[in-house]
A protein has these predicted regions:
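Extracytoplasmic
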Residues: 1-192
Length: 192
């Protein structure tokens, strides 16, 4: 069984462990083969702010600022209107269910998934929450695989035999990756 520590004291990730703002969650990872790896976490925010959860990641002494995205939902699906008939944006709520995502490189302009080159052997890893508290249930360390191109992916699928066109409605989202995302109507022929 893996040993986890919070601020140097033993911690068990059974149902969940609370990682409060400023606390350090540390563990070791035994890597079997040299290569590029990514770290995933199953988590839920405890005191969500209107931004991603920033964390300090230390691997064998080297440090990096990483982020975990938070998911958001509208408190009400029906938008009220003000006296001028304009829609009023409902209260934003952080999704309270557990979800899994990979650590993102906060210093990268595109905030891509953080890829760590690791050698065979045991590595000391620690995560320090810098902006908000989380409940963590699982931590994954997985060998990174370069995504295949769409052409390669579609070549593996059976040929399209669908003769109908389907239209998907996308205004009523269930969750969103940013609390400021809003559905909006644009009257622009170029968008059709």
């Amino acid at each position: 069984a893996e040993t986890f520590k919070i601020n140097g004291k033993a911690a068990v990730i059974g149902n969940a462990v609370e990682l409060k703002d400023g606390e350090v969650l540390s563990f070791t990872a035994d890597i079997e083969t040299d290569g590029d790896y990514i770290i995933g976490i199953e988590y839920t925010p405890l005191n969500a702010l209107y931004m991603d959860c920033l964390m300090n990641l230390a691997v064998d002494g080297g440090e990096k600022i990483v982020s975990l995205p938070l998911l958001w939902a509208d408190a009400a699906s029906e938008y009220g209107t003000d006296r001028m008939g304009n829609q009023i944006v409902p209260e934003q709520l952080a999704v309270s269910e557990y979800y899994t995502d990979w650590l993102h490189d906060y210093g990268d302009t595109d905030k891509n998934i953080l890829i760590l080159p690791l050698k065979t052997g045991v590595h000391s890893i620690s995560l320090t929450s810098e902006s908000q508290s989380l409940k963590v249930t699982k931590i994954y360390i997985k060998k990174y695989r370069e995504p295949v191109s769409y052409a390669e992916y579609s070549a593996q699928l059976p040929k399209n035999t669908v003769s109908e066109t389907y239209t998907l409605e996308a205004e009523e989202y269930s969750v969103k990756s940013d609390s400021f995302i809003r559905a909006a109507s644009r009257k622009n022929a170029a968008l059709y």
